[in-house]
């Protein structure tokens, strides 16, 4: 932590098409080597695929998917008397969003479809339907927290 106090959070500018900060954050999360244009193109094509397949607004499907991915609980390692305990803690709202976006992008990249547009679109659709690898990651995280409930009193 800096000596001058906590660092101020930088506000992300909303994206030009959907005027959403969430979409802008997803674009930033997908970006590799600073190529924002490529990242935007991939995301917008994915949203077109989603709209085509569902007939619903892509933004609504994306928000539902993200809501299904974002974790409520996670475990943090805490050292007590020479032993490490996995202590369940609640996830802060900003971290929930960050984890949700991170898992969405990571598991979309691991999928088997040919293009990233298809991978991302399918992962978002799966997440919106409460299936897919990103939702499984959330369930595993919650299971871990539930299994280590006994150590909840070590919370800080």
Swiss-Prot record:
* Record flagged with keyword Transit peptide: no
Annotated Gene Ontology cellular components are:
small ribosomal subunit
Q: Which InterPro entries match?
A: Ribosomal_uS7, Ribosomal_uS7_bac/org-type, Ribosomal_uS7_CS, Ribosomal_uS7_dom, Ribosomal_uS7_dom_sf
An annotated Gene Ontology molecular function: rRNA binding
User: A GO term (biological process) for this protein?
Assistant: translation
Keyword annotations for this protein?
Answer: Ribonucleoprotein, Ribosomal protein, RNA-binding, rRNA-binding, tRNA-binding
**Keyword hit for Nucleotidyltransferase:** no
Membrane-crossing segments per the record: none
Annotated PANTHER family: RIBOSOMAL PROTEIN S7
Q: What does this protein do?
A: One of the primary rRNA binding proteins, it binds directly to 16S rRNA where it nucleates assembly of the head domain of the 30S subunit. Is located at the subunit interface close to the decoding center, probably blocks exit of the E-site tRNA.
Q: How does it assemble?
A: Part of the 30S ribosomal subunit. Contacts proteins S9 and S11.
The record ties this protein, via HAMAP family, to:
Ribosomal_uS7_B
* Family note: Belongs to the universal ribosomal protein uS7 family.
Report what the protein is called: Small ribosomal subunit protein uS7
Q: What is the lineage of its organism?
A: Bacteria, Bacillati, Bacillota, Bacilli, Bacillales
Query: What gene makes this protein?
Result: rpsG
């Amino acid at each position: 932590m800096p000596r001058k106090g906590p660092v101020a959070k930088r506000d992300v500018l909303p994206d030009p098409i959907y005027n959403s900060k969430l979409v802008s954050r997803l674009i930033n999360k997908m970006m590799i080597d600073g190529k924002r244009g490529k990242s935007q193109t991939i995301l917008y094509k994915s949203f077109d695929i989603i709209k085509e397949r569902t007939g619903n607004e892509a933004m609504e499907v994306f928000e539902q998917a993200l809501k299904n991915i974002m974790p409520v609980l996670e475990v943090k390692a805490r050292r007590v008397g020479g032993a490490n305990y996995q202590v369940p803690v609640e996830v802060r709202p900003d971290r929930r969003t960050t984890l949700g976006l991170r898992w969405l992008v990571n598991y979309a990249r691991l999928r088997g479809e040919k293009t990233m547009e298809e991978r991302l679109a399918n992962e978002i659709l799966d997440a919106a339907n409460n299936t897919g690898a990103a939702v499984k990651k959330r369930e595993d995280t919650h299971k871990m927290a539930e299994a280590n409930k006994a150590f909840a009193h070590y919370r800080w």
